[in-house]
């Protein structure tokens, strides 16, 4: 297994996991869309998965945690659950990739290390795929509402920074997991496949003749 490839995959996966945590925490999934008469508004709305914030033109910001989960939009409810699962799977992947690292002493057997590291890579990929769902779903909802004439201009939103952070984090998770999986040694010859005892028996028989 290539140590450099494994370290690169673990590093990218860890950065992706941190990106998932950041995007899940910051209240920047949806921001006020400045269109029409809204361009002179004195405040900006930020909406996240756990809270919403109002930023005044003076720079003062007030945030409030959502009182009821059922009052949230469907995409935000699902994004909460999916990103939490993605973060948990990513954490498991990090532990597995560290334990299976060639530069660590958690496992003595190299074959076991390779298997554990590859398992971590698969977990990183799963976490990345899960991480792609919430920003894509939210982005689709924002675009649909933005071009919906029945939605008031004051209620229309644009993409927040958290959506782009989550997309980037998910890509890093998938790439990191792919590197860990590709670093698994292929075509190894097991010592059990050697026929040394048979050749020794053949030499012994020739001596008796």
From Swiss-Prot:
Membrane topology: Multi-pass membrane protein
Protein name per the record: Claudin-like protein ZF-A9
GO biological process, one term: cell adhesion
Subcellular location(s) of the protein: Cell membrane; Cell junction, Tight junction
GO terms assigned for molecular function: identical protein binding; structural molecule activity
PROSITE patterns, per the entry: CLAUDIN
Organism: Danio rerio (Zebrafish)
Keyword Transmembrane helix recorded: yes
Membrane-spanning parts: 8-28, 81-101, 114-134, 159-179
Lineage, highest ranks first: Eukaryota, Metazoa, Chordata, Craniata, Vertebrata
InterPro entries: Claudin, Claudin_CS, PMP22/EMP/MP20/Claudin
Keywords: Cell junction, Cell membrane, Membrane, Tight junction, Transmembrane, Transmembrane helix
Highest taxon in the source lineage: Eukaryota
Keyword Transmembrane helix part of the UniProt annotation: yes
UniProt feature, compositional bias: Polar residues: 188-201
Family membership: Belongs to the claudin family.
A GO cellular component entry from the record: bicellular tight junction
